[in-house]
């Protein structure tokens, strides 16, 4: 079996799934103390980089996703599947796990 090379352009979400690049977590506290990786909270904000075709309705048609590529979104803390590509962190979410689009 040949090895598969993963990149953002090769990941195509299915159904109502959304591929999000996770925003960087804070390195320092407000007082200037550096945080070790174990003390950092998991970020809940990221930028949408790929969107699936949408959820299938009962009649077989597709419901268009409410988010699009480039949107910044707030998502549930423990939602999705974490994926690391190179040095960047991503999460593959179901659209229902997205709480809001943020500007």
UniProtKB/Swiss-Prot annotation:
Belongs to the GroES chaperonin family. It comes from Synechococcus sp. (strain CC9605). Heptamer of 7 subunits arranged in a ring. Interacts with the chaperonin GroEL. Keywords: Chaperone, Cytoplasm. GO terms for molecular function: ATP binding; metal ion binding; protein folding chaperone; protein-folding chaperone binding; unfolded protein binding. This is Co-chaperonin GroES. It comes from the Bacteria. It is found in: Cytoplasm. One of its GO terms (biological process) is chaperone cofactor-dependent protein refolding. InterPro entries: Chaperonin_GroES, Chaperonin_GroES_sf, Chaprnonin_Cpn10_CS, GroES-like_sf. Together with the chaperonin GroEL, plays an essential role in assisting protein folding. The GroEL-GroES system forms a nano-cage that allows encapsulation of the non-native substrate proteins and provides a physical environment optimized to promote and accelerate protein folding. GroES binds to the apical surface of the GroEL ring, thereby capping the opening of the GroEL channel. Pfam families: Cpn10. GO terms for cellular component: cytoplasm.
């Amino acid at each position: 079996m040949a090895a598969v090379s993963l990149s953002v352009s090769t990941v195509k979400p299915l159904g109502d799934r959304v591929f999000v690049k996770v925003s960087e977590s804070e390195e320092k506290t407000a007082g200037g103390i550096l945080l070790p990786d174990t003390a950092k909270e998991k970020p809940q904000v990221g930028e949408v980089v790929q969107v699936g075709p949408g959820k299938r309705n009962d009649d077989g048609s597709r419901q268009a996703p409410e988010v699009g590529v480039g949107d910044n979104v707030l998502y549930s803390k423990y939602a999705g599947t974490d994926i690391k590509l190179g040095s960047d962190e991503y999460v593959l979410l179901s659209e229902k796990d997205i709480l809001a689009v943020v500007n």
